[in-house]
Each structure stands twice: as structure tokens, then as C-alpha cells.
Amino acid sequence: MRSIDIHDHVKGRSIYLDDIPLIQGTLFARVFTSNVAHGRIIKLDISKARDLEGVHKVLISSDITGINQIGGIIDDEPLMAENIVDFIGMPIALVLADSESIARKACKLIDCKIEAFEEITDPRIAYEKGALIIPSKKFILGDTESTWSSCSHIFEGKADINGQEHLYIETQGAYAQPVEGGKIKVYSSTQGPTAVQRAVAKVTGMEMHSIEVDVTRIGGGFGGKEDQANAWAALCALGTHITGRPVKYSLSREEDIYMTGKRHPYSADFKIGFDNKLKILAYEVTFFQNAGAAADLSPAVLERTLFHCTNAYFIPNVIAI
């Protein structure tokens, strides 16, 4: 099947976020982020950054005009840190400046001290400590307990699957523009424009019908530009809502890699039983999903894990947790 877009792609005619002509007066955004995985902010001084020539605003969580929350399934993901930081790369302050270079320079002038807390990066440890993001779910089919005695062969073990960077060619980004009547138009490189619209409405305090989200092209997504695209659109829209000027933020590759979520690492304990013809009779598995600092779409991914865990086989007796 031929792609209807292929000719525009190979001839360079496809319009991506960075190909959109800039409106005069556009401000460029950069975020100052946490260098600690988990901790409390004990000092935050933005005065030097704010006073730098070419800087128009330095926004922190208290400047948010709506709700400091972009969580999709669960409201557990602040757009900017208030007192607690939850991951390395968590936005603490948003700089709006005349150029990207000035915005970067301003970020280096922000003085922040963070008291580090214990960090939990292993979901098995989180389970032991009762620190799961959501309660465990269970999928049951048949009766495994009464089936083990009928199995000629039983294998038990542990499997580990590493995470994965989506590594889309076009990095995350957004471009917000003011529209007459106090409305905002947001260009976003997203797989979920409605999710972006909802997040922008939360953060700005605006009605959803006052926010238009436009997607020109997505330079690759692979699941990495679903809810992960929301933060950058919300930050740009917040900047536009407060300043009345267009705001653009295109993440560098370095920023994208350390500030955005990945495909989940998994660890699993399994027990599987076969009859003497090697037909699978029973299967028990406990999955430990590393969801990172916030739920994002992890609950839905976990449900798919449970429903798909038997793969192409029909196994009459299953317990999946």
C-alpha cells in the first residue's frame, strides 16, 4: 500500500512544528528542571534570570492560572514542581525570552537547592513498601491451583524486559498563539489532540471550547507523543495566556531524552505447567511495571499486559497480576 504522504515527505514539503512561520513577537520557552530524582525544594531564587535582558517572564507553579495538574488517567502529575520534585528533569520554572539562547542562559541563572529524599526506582521495592501508583489488578481464568497436580512439567522463573526510548525523529514541542476573543491556538506534535486540549484547559483555567489544538505532522510518535505531549503544549499555552504573546518550545534531543517518559521496563515472576504432550495447562505470572514518577497511561498499559499475557495461546487456567 502506497503512502499518500510519501511524495511530500521525500521532497521536503511536509510541514512540521519547526516549519510553521513564526509570528512577530514570539517568545521562546525553556524550563529549569530538577537535578534530583526525589526531594523537597528548600530554596528557589529566580531573580537573576528574571532580570536578564531579553527575558520577559519566569513562571513558577504559583503563577499557574488554573490547576497545576496534567495527569490523564490519574491526577498525580503536576506540570511544575511546587514543593516536591518527583524525577530528574521535572520542570520547576518556565523562562520566556526573546530567543532560545537567552532562555537557556536564564535557566543557568536560577538558584535552586533541593533536599534529596530516598528514591525508589525498582517496582519490586515499591511493591514491598506499599508505594505503588495504583492498586494491583488481577486477571483470573479457570483454576490454576487444582491444575498443577495434573502437569507433567512445571517451570518457574523470572524474566526482565528493559525499557525503551521512543526516539522519534522530531522531538516534543508546541507553539501557542493568541486568538481574538481571548482564545488560544496550540500547534502540538501530539498523537492525542483532545488530551492536549484537556491539559491546556486545566492549566490555564480556560474552557475547552476556547482552545484549538492543531497537528500539522508528527515526526514519529510510537506512543511517546500521547499524553507525553501534554506538558509542552500546556507550558506554551500558559505563557501565551499570561503574556498575550505567541510562545514556542521545541525540545532539544537531550531535553527530550531526560525529561520525557519511556516505554516501561518490566520484571515478571512466572510459573507454567505442561502435560506430557507439552500442551500448556496452567500459567501464573506477576508483573512488576516500572511506571516512573507518575501514572500517565501506565494503568492502561498494565491492563493490556494482563489481557495479552497469554499471547496467541489458549491457556485454560491463568492467574495474571
Predicted regions and their residues:
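Glycine-rich and small/hydrophobic secondary-structure elements
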Residues: D76-I102, G223-F274
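Flexible, low-hydrophobicity surface segments
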Residues: M1-P135, I154-G157, I242, H308
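Helix-loop-helix junctions that connect adjacent transmembrane helices in secondary transporters/permeases
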Residues: R124-T204
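Flexible hinge/switch segments at interdomain interfaces of large molecular machines
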Residues: Y16-L27, L167-Q172, N317-I321
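Beta-strand segments within the central parallel beta-sheet cores of soluble alpha/beta enzyme folds
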Residues: I60-S61, S210-T216, G244-E254, L281-T286, ...
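Gly/Pro-rich active-site capping loops and adjacent beta-alpha segments
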Residues: I102-T121, V196, D256-I321
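Alpha-helical support elements that line or immediately flank enzyme active sites
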Residues: V31-L59, L94-K113, A174-T216, G223-T243, ...
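Short coil/turn connectors at secondary-structure junctions
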Residues: G25-F28, E53-H56, E82, G89-I92, ...
